[in-house]
Amino acid sequence: EGVEYSRRLAEKVKALDPSRYVINSINGWYNMFSSLSALVRRKRPAAPGSGLADTHKRTSGYINPLMNTVNRFMDLIVALPLVDWGTRAAFAAVDVAGYNYMAGRYAMDGRLYPRRVICGSESFPPEIARNWRRVKRLAHVIGDFTWAGWDYLGEAGLCTWQYGANQALYKPYPCILADSPLIDITGQRQAQSYLHEIVWGLRKDPYIAVRPLNHAGETPSKSVWRGTNAIASWTWPGCEGRPALIEVYADAAWVELFLNGRSLGRKAAGDRRDFKAIFRTVYQPGELRAVAYDRGGRETGRAVLCSASGALDLRVQPESTALRADGADLAYIHIALAGTDGIVDPLAERLVTVRVEGAGSLQGFGSANPLSQERFTDDTHTTYQGRALAVVRAGNQAGSVRVEVSAPGCQTRILVLPVQ
């Protein structure tokens, strides 16, 4: 039935616009289980209440935890003939075969189907280096997409690294976000996105990220949809003397890390190390500096993280300085708790209040905290990793909108945005 729908949908798209390429993205692992379930049901219908009757109805809430558990064997599983048997007819109906978590088939299917064009339509973020090597090596593989680029509401906790007792893949309320590791729900880039940028050859300078020092020594329950929970910060007040794990991403043969001018050593990086080097030290405030070198020892780039200094205060930065009076235009206002040098404190959690008056209204207000009982429709919200985001909607009348942002112990900030 699914194959027939694939064919009909592809034909409809072609009829509407022959210039469009059509892709059908299939999870071979999930499709294999569905195919087996269908075969079993045809041969021996399950009795009501047996627990087997609804096997075919199980969705990502059932299959994703299995994928998280057996990830190390995924390449072997998707190479099974049954995966090919269950997908070849559907792929034959489209221009591009979208492989969800089936990178283990890229090479073999290039031999089995020489005319098939393949795209990695969904893949695990931690596998970007390995998958991109395949994209560059195999001419019939045209690209790779990661799940997921931008965080979203739903599949709660899919990508979260949880500290404490061992947690299931999906988390109960108050977890509300998937916690995707590339761009958080407020639009802030995370460390994983910079690793992707480096793997793709789009960034020459290295990138430094630090595992949360407030959880130093703890072992998190991990998800294969997140490669790291490190963040680009060397500001960890109250964590002096704790062991620090530092990740440096670099498209370079070697990378050297310095703490307050003292070398912590030089380690291999680049493609042979999946573009990542790991350093360990003891936290002390100051400056972390990473220097990348080519094979000849010549510097190719550097990155620096400094600790915040001075008293924390509110930093408010709107993405736009004016709005259209159309009732729809939005201003995204980034709010952060930072030192006098503008460096954000990731451990700063304060209740922020946003008041909006005039020719606009507060459309939404929140943070990237995946576990929160606060509402996006309220005018108060607690910062997460020192940040929050307010969204102001313009009205239909020209004028100005006044935005007041306040937090305990901080100077109140006021923005006035013209609405024209």
Q: What residues fall within each predicted segment?
A:
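Short glycine/proline/serine/threonine-rich loop/turn segments at secondary-structure transition edges
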Residues: 396-402
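Substrate-binding clefts and catalytic carboxylate motifs of secreted carbohydrate-active enzymes
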Residues: 11-15, 22-328, 340-345
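Short aromatic-acidic-glycine turn motif
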Residues: 267-269, 311-315, 355-371
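Short, hydrophobic beta-strand segments
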Residues: 277-283, 377-396
